[in-house]
Amino acid sequence: MDAIELRMGEMRRYIITMIDEHSDYVLALAVPSLNSDIVNHFFSRAARLFPVGISQIITDNGKEFLGSFDKTLQEAAIKHLWTYPYTPKMNAICERFNRALREQFIEFNEILLFEDLALFNLKLAEYLALYNSKRPEYRRASRAKPDH
């Protein structure tokens, strides 16, 4: 799980991303601000949509992954693993998805992200549906894709 920060002038937007390392199933949501409560809300909704149960989460040491989010993980008996500072390779699968998301979607919709967040999220959901079910390349051919 990770967050992407984007800026346009003084404005900031964030995209929270989450990927299952076994199936490559991904979810993401653009938000106007980022804190533990927002990440917790995203995670609570995302956990219901994931095709498999969640046993552990890997995040960086951002403050948005502490507080109510970390408490929710503890209550659900989900192991929370933190990466070491400045070591993106420890969360490489999520970081690689973030790069693909930037190159394949955000670059073409960045203005919309700052002008109409709801419409951006609608288009993001369409992109993720395609990414999760019909993308031509798979990171690992042996991985099973969810049947949706």
Residue ranges and their predicted role:
Residues 1-27, 33:
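An active-site-proximal beta-strand-loop segment
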Residues 2, 18, 24, 43, ...:
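Mobile genetic element proteins and their domesticated derivatives, centered on retroelements
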Residues 11, 29-52:
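Active-site beta-loop-alpha junctions of metal-dependent nucleic acid enzymes
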Residues 24-29, 81-83, 107-108:
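Short small-residue beta-strand/loop micro-motif enriched in glycine and branched aliphatics
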Residues 34, 52-66, 141-145:
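Acidic/histidine-rich, metal-coordinating catalytic segments
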Residues 40, 65-69:
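Short, well-ordered alpha-helical microsegments
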Residues 56-61, 75-93, 109-115:
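RNase H-like polynucleotidyl transferase catalytic core
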Residues 67, 76, 99, 103-148:
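C-terminal domain-tail junction helix/linker
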